[in-house]
Amino acid sequence: LKLPRSILMVTLSDVDTGAPKAIMSANLLSAMRTGAMPAMSAKYLARKDSRVLSLIGPGVINKCALMCYMEVLPHIEKIKLRGSSVNSRTALAMKEFIEEKYPQVKEIEICSTLREACEDADVVSEAMSVTKENMEEFHLEWLKKGATVFSMGSFLYRQFDDFLGTKMVVDNYGMYEKYMNNFIARGPVDAFGNKREWVI
């Protein structure tokens, strides 16, 4: 049917009467909000001299995130893309978008594996939309020291349990509560014996 992954709606109502003034799609609004959140976080959490950005899942969410990242991470000069394959239509479309909109980016690499996409990245932005069976396993050793990971999609959160260390940052505790149950069920410390700390 060529439908988007989610179909969202918003109603604009008269502030005095409550009468609806517009009922319309909220997909773009949701994508921009979802993309803006990690970029706002990157402003405070990512290295100020970040030069390599990795977009895992080059669809609409990471496209919106990219536009926001480029506002707060002005030194980005290389972008790595990981789609479903090196011939992914969304990855190729994202590459063209970057070439047209961000001429300051000197290199754009479409990666064949998740590992390749994560290695040497200062910021990893994940917004995959895949089934659990098709998720690639994520490993700590792929990340460089000081890298920041933003996950908005389908990373298996238990895969982060051994290396996130002491802190996870979320924008809405209730929204992520089910995801965090994976950690809470394993106790208050990670595999290294570090106490988990949640920042909201």
Predicted regions and their residues:
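N-terminal ligand-binding/catalytic initiation module
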Residues: 1-33, 37-39, 46-49, 200
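Short internal alpha-helix immediately C-terminal to a glycine-rich phosphate-binding loop
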Residues: 33-54, 60-72
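Short, conserved loop/helix-junction motifs that constitute active-site signature segments
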Residues: 72-74, 138-145, 160-164
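NAD(P)-binding Rossmann-fold cofactor-contacting core
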Residues: 72-102
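Short acidic-hydrophobic, aromatic-tinged amphipathic segments that line or gate anion-handling sites
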Residues: 106-116, 169
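Rossmann-fold NAD(P) dinucleotide-binding segment
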Residues: 119-120, 131-148
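Short glycine-/small-residue-rich Rossmann-like dinucleotide-binding loops
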Residues: 128-130, 153-154, 173
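Adenosine-phosphate binding glycine-rich loop
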Residues: 161-200
